[in-house]
Swiss-Prot record:
NCBIfam families: fdhD_narQ. It is found in: Cytoplasm. Required for formate dehydrogenase (FDH) activity. Acts as a sulfur carrier protein that transfers sulfur from IscS to the molybdenum cofactor prior to its insertion into FDH. Belongs to the FdhD family. The keyword Ribosomal protein does not apply. SUPFAM superfamilies: Cytidine deaminase-like. This is Sulfur carrier protein FdhD. Keywords: Cytoplasm, Molybdenum cofactor biosynthesis. The active site is at residue 121. It comes from Yersinia pseudotuberculosis serotype O:3 (strain YPIII). One of its GO terms (biological process) is Mo-molybdopterin cofactor biosynthetic process. GO terms for cellular component: cytoplasm. The lineage of its organism: Bacteria, Pseudomonadati, Pseudomonadota, Gammaproteobacteria, Enterobacterales. It holds the Pfam family FdhD-NarQ. One of its GO terms (molecular function) is sulfurtransferase activity.
Length: 274
């Protein structure tokens, strides 16, 4: 399998996922100049030769994305269910070819659904409303987080957003330990993709104690993905939706929104928060 490493802050000359383009800057006078824009390309996830989904994503950390998506969608239960990941750039996008174990591929074929172009919609391609909610084993109560350490994590979040710092155009997802130290993270133009990338990286790291921190709002799908990968606490910089709160309550996940320096809103299972 492709090696997955935690993201690091890079110089602008090294940054993947951003390009400079000619623009016309308008203030009082029109002035031609160059500006950085985040890249957004179609990425097809292909399992054992069969295309499963095409999503718009920033073309970096794609092996982590493939692993995290496979885990958070319940296609696999552990990284060992994937034998290989191969990334193939093409003229119209990127193919990520994932070789599944025969048992997992058989399961995928049974539940396979047509899902195309899902950048922010978890309902696309689902035939029945009941299929929106995947069965999730209720999380145990083994984690705790002191909100005094949240400020430390928030101050470090931009470290995993080199493209975002250049363009102002990406979401971030990071894993923070109970002391608020940011252990690793990812960015993407899509908030769900950024989270999947993080979950893929976490699956290859010994990170158990801690929480997920995202720079976006918390939708039901963000909650579902987090819980599917066994994380017990999700901090969102913005708000949560009503459905996100319902799903978090049901699966025993502690959901925290409006995570800002010195304050936060705890929506569900506050016993994990000190």
């Amino acid at each position: 399998m492709s090696q997955i490493k935690p993201s690091r802050l890079s110089s602008s000359a090294e940054i993947r996922g951003a390009r400079q383009l000619d623009v016309l800057q308008r203030h009082k006078l029109a002035e031609p100049q160059q500006d950085w824009l985040a890249e957004e390309v179609p990425v097809a996830l292909v399992y054992n030769g069969i295309s499963h989904v095409v999503m718009m994503a920033t073309p970096k950390d794609l092996a982590a994305f493939a692993l995290g998506f496979s885990l958070s969608e319940g296609i696999i239960s552990s990284p060992q269910d994937i034998y290989a990941i191969e990334i193939t750039p093409g003229c119209n996008g990127i193919e990520v070819n994932i070789e599944l174990s025969s048992r997992r591929f058989a399961g995928l074929k049974e539940r396979r659904r047509a899902m195309a172009g899902r950048t922010g919609c978890g309902v696309c391609g689902i035939e029945q409303l009941d299929d929106i909610f995947r069965p999730i084993t209720p999380l145990p109560f083994t984690q705790a987080f002191n909100l005094e350490h949240l400020d430390t994590a928030l101050a470090q979040l931009k470290q995993v957003q080199p493209v975002g710092q250049l363009t102002g155009c990406t979401h971030a997802a990071a894993w923070i330990n109970p002391e608020g130290e940011l252990l690793g993270g990812c960015e993407d133009v899509g908030r769900h993709v950024a989270l999947d990338k993080l979950l893929g990286i976490r699956a290859k790291q010994p990170w158990q104690q801690g929480a997920v921190l995202v720079s976006s709002r918390a939708s039901y799908e963000m909650v579902q993905k987090t819980a599917m990968c066994g994380a017990e606490i999700l901090f969102a910089v913005s708000a949560a939706t009503t459905l996100a709160v319902e799903v978090a309550e049901r699966c025993n996940l502690t959901l925290v929104g409006f995570s800002k320096p010195g304050r936060a809103t705890v929506y569900t299972h506050p016993q994990r928060i000190k």
